[in-house]
């Protein structure tokens, strides 16, 4: 633990210097003229959106904003049960056909009425999108029955279809605008949601205004602003000074301080987010091509100590990519438990008794992930593995990897937007998925995953996911580290804000009474 503390102290000092420099260069992050008004709520997050069109860019920062502009056919209640939304009712015509009946009189922000044609156009477009087609791998086609009725046809029976339709990436877009200009949503997104787009300044903010014709009723606050504040500590400071009202991803080290301040509080609840290390199974570092080496890396990691030292206990050690609370989560010990001698034994068997050198790419804007990687660097040194931690811009990192650039390993976080194991497993193990950054390819695992999609018995489907997790604990293309607690800081005057494990927050019922 002394080594862990020393490693953390080093990275925190470095990050503190970077933060101070960043603050001097970016005073505009300090506030806006509207921050103090009761008719405005300002929330801050670490990253900017990649696009206002989530078929073009889908990072978490994107759907944190777009989920307030666009509506889905169905959604979740506070207990993650599927409830009506744009679709007021539905029924299964057979195992692979779901008929849905739309609400009448729902208007897009430009006054045009939502119809079944918009649903079909949106999903056809999604299936042809390089960015989100993986999220619709289960979808065969959409049929328009009449103006307010559609049939969702799946590729065979797809048990979690309703959960898939709750995904913020399944929001409905306007056919009449996209037919005229396929890039219309990138500059002026128009949905049916509680907020309308006003303005975006890239790298700084997105401003929204309440939809006065929202089908769901009166929106609680007139203006909503998303502020980009990369430094986690700066988000906490802005919350304390009242320059923002809500801060996403509060650093665990700030929780106690914010909770003792009468003007602020930190909301905490389990999430479906899992933090893990992606190992490139085709890396130019040949050692990483051997599953025994990848297992050894996990055996060398003390996940309990990692959660304690980096997350201050606001995380749970993870055994698989399927997070706590997600359907298919296996709470049995399928992970490779911390065992230094076992790690050394596996390295020796693989031909690396003295270890080897590797690099880990980590998002430069994420203080917590950088701290974690420095601790991992220290832990892996105990078995002779020399790790170079290389911070870089997250977007550059993702683009480099997706385009086939060589790398050894990178820090990764997966947001399960469906609450189902199928979502995270398909994205990360399918050879066709752009999210399969490890280049993992196991036909047996893929066959099991596809077969599980049609199982209607929950116990049978969960058993398949458990089997898949066990196989992946041996192959280990991904090394799961922890499942996150949601940590969101709020000002005392804010009411109506509710955490959810999906972490895409809606604001129609959030008021600012400060």
Descriptions of predicted regions:
Residues 44-94, 124, 190, 489:
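N-terminal lobe/hinge region of extracytoplasmic solute-binding protein
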Residues 77-81, 167-219, 223, 345:
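Gly/Pro-rich hinge or "lid" segments in bacterial periplasmic/extracellular proteins
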Residues 91, 95, 134-177:
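Surface-exposed binding/hinge segments that line
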Residues 116-122, 147-151, 193-194, 221-223, ...:
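Alpha-helical secondary-structure segments
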Residues 212-257:
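Ligand-site clamp/hinge motif
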Residues 316-349, 366-369:
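Structural transition elements
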Residues 388-397, 423-491, 514:
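Extracytoplasmic/peripheral linker and loop segments enriched in polar/acidic and small residues
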Residues 488-514:
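Long beta-strand-rich cores associated with HINT superfamily self-processing modules
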């Amino acid at each position: 633990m002394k080594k862990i503390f020393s490693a953390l102290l080093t990275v925190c000092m470095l990050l503190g210097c970077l933060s101070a420099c960043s603050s001097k260069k970016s005073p505009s992050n300090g506030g806006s003229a509207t921050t103090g008004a009761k008719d405005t709520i300002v929330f801050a997050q670490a990253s900017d959106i990649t696009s206002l069109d989530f078929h073009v860019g889908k990072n978490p920062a994107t759907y944190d904003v777009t989920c307030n502009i666009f509506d889905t056919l169905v959604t979740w209640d506070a207990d993650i049960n599927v409830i009506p939304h744009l679709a007021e009712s539905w029924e299964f015509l057979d195992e692979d056909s779901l008929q849905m009946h739309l609400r009448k009189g729902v208007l897009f922000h430009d006054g045009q009425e939502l119809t079944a044609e918009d649903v079909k156009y949106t999903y056809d477009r999604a299936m042809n999108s390089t960015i989100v087609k993986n999220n619709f791998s289960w979808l065969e086609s959409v049929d328009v029955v009449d103006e307010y009725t559609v049939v969702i046809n799946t590729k065979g029976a797809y048990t979690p279809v309703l959960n898939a339709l709750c995904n913020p990436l399944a929001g409905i877009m306007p056919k009449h605008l996209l037919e005229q200009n396929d890039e219309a949503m990138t500059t002026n997104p128009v949905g049916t949601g509680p907020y309308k787009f006003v303005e975006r300044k890239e790298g700084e903010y997105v401003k929204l205004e309440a939809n006065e014709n929202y089908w769901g009723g009166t929106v609680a606050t007139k203006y909503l602003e998303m502020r980009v504040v990369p430094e986690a500590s700066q988000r906490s400071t802005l919350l304390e000074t009242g320059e923002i009202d809500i801060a996403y991803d509060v650093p665990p080290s700030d929780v106690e301080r914010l909770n003792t301040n009468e003007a602020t509080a930190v909301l905490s609840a389990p999430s479906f987010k899992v933090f893990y290390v992606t190992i490139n199974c085709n890396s130019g570092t040949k050692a990483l091509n051997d599953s025994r080496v990848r297992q050894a890396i996990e055996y060398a990691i003390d996940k309990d100590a990692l959660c304690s030292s980096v997350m201050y206990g606001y995380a749970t050690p993870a055994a698989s990519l399927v997070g706590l609370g997600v359907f298919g989560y296996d709470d049995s010990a399928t992970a490779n438990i911390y065992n230094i001698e076992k790690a050394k034994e596996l390295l020796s068997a693989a031909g690396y008794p003295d270890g080897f050198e590797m690099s880990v790419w980590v998002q430069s804007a994420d203080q917590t992930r950088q701290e974690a990687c420095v601790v991992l660097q220290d832990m892996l040194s105990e078995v002779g593995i020399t790790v170079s931690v290389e911070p870089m811009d997250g977007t550059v990192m993702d683009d480099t990897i997706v385009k086939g650039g060589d790398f050894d390993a990178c820090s990764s976080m997966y947001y399960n937007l469906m609450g189902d194991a199928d979502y995270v497993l398909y994205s990360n193990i399918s050879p066709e998925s752009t999210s399969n950054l490890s280049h993992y390819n196991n036909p047996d695992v893929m066959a099991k995953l596809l077969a599980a999609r049609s199982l209607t018995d929950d116990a049978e489907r969960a058993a398949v996911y458990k089997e898949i997790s066990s196989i992946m604990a041996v192959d280990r293309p991904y090394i799961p580290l922890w499942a996150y607690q949601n940590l969101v800081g709020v000002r005392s005057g804010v009411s109506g804000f509710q955490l959810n494990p999906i972490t895409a927050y809606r604001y129609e019922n959030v008021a600012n009474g400060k």
